[in-house]
Amino acid sequence: MASGLVRLLQQGPRCLLAPVAPKLVPPVRGVKRGFRAAFRFQKELERQRLLRCPPPPVRRSEKPNWDYHAEIQAFGHRLQENFSLDLLKTAFVNSCYIKSEEAKRQQLGIEKEAVLLNLKSNQELSEQGTSFSQTCLTQFLEDEYPDLPTEGIKNLVEFLTGEDVVCHVARNLAVEQLTLSEEFPVPPTVLQQTFFAVIGALLQSSGPERTALFIRDFLITQMTGKELFEMWKIINPMGLLVEELKKRNISAPESRLTRQSGGTTALPLYFVGLYCDKKLIAEGPGETVLVAEEEAARVALRKLYGFTENRRPWNYSKPKETLRAEKSITAS
């Protein structure tokens, strides 16, 4: 104790009067900033959980602010088509929905007379829409590609009326949200049937001309960017080419290797040309000579059918006045 006082006196009076330096304390994080960080972390955890286990899809009718009658009316206005509301409502009612609702009523113990729903299935409208769509598409394709054979026209029509194309169009037109079905998401077969029922309702409401334009605008457009043999699957292109040339009184094609590169590498490339009467009619690439020959045959078929990559695009500006829509409706 005494030695400490002696040292303070030796340092002088200024040391006694000097203020004590404050102790440095690490800054404490604010409550607000900590809450924000925790909230962001919680949101990230929730996002990762939804990515791992996404929730099951929910019908739009099970969410708030849903008016089915208003949605039906808005559907026609959105497409700029005049539908009969009764026909349009019928087009969205599937037989599986009627059966499921009647079964639910029976389980609740409701009387048999009250179990039956006053709803009509869209089966008849769907059959009319399917028949008219196939006939109308056949006429469109025959007028646009007169050199395409009947088998090719048939395959293109099957592609445009298939489940993949029709369901893609129906989902983008919000047909799935209005469809009354037992299951959700709506199965592809049910959605396809509903879309053709909508076409059948439009056919009875606005006539064949407006329905033909509807088919042109929403189904023919699905051919954009598609190659012919993506829609028409053929197994033996060379055999088909020989038949087509024979119909035109042209000699059978002769294949020749025109170019090649990297034959000893892992990625070889061969070009095979097809000659008729010493004239090059087509040339195609491939990783083998056989594949290149088949591709050359496909190129030649595209030229014969007028379905080349640089073909004239489909004219959507003016509908044809001589459309055989009356014949379509009578045939359907």
Curated annotation (Swiss-Prot):
Gene Ontology biological process terms, A to Z: mitochondrial translational elongation; RNA processing
Keyword field: Endonuclease, Hydrolase, Mitochondrion, Nuclease, Ribonucleoprotein, Ribosomal protein, RNA-binding, Transit peptide
Domain DRBM: 236-306
GO MF annotations, alphabetized: double-stranded RNA binding; ribonuclease III activity
Keyword flag Lipid metabolism: no
Residue ranges of domain RNase III in the record: 86-228
Location of the transit peptide in the chain: 1-30
E.C. number: 3.1.26.-
Places the protein is found: Mitochondrion
CDD domains (alphabetical): DSRM_MRPL44 (cd19874)
PROSITE patterns hit by this protein: DS_RBD
Entry's Gene Ontology cellular component terms: microprocessor complex; mitochondrial large ribosomal subunit
Gene3D superfamilies listed in its UniProt record: 3.30.160.20, Ribonuclease III domain (1.10.1520.10)
PANTHER family for this protein: LARGE RIBOSOMAL SUBUNIT PROTEIN ML44 (PTHR11207:SF5), RIBONUCLEASE III (PTHR11207)
Record-stated family: Belongs to the ribonuclease III family. Mitochondrion-specific ribosomal protein mL44 subfamily.
Assembly with partners or alone: Component of the mitochondrial ribosome large subunit (39S) which comprises a 16S rRNA and about 50 distinct proteins.
Function recorded in the entry: Component of the 39S subunit of mitochondrial ribosome. May have a function in the assembly/stability of nascent mitochondrial polypeptides exiting the ribosome.
This protein's name: Large ribosomal subunit protein mL44
Organism, as annotated: Pongo abelii (Sumatran orangutan)
Taxonomic placement: Eukaryota, Metazoa, Chordata, Craniata, Vertebrata
Gene: MRPL44
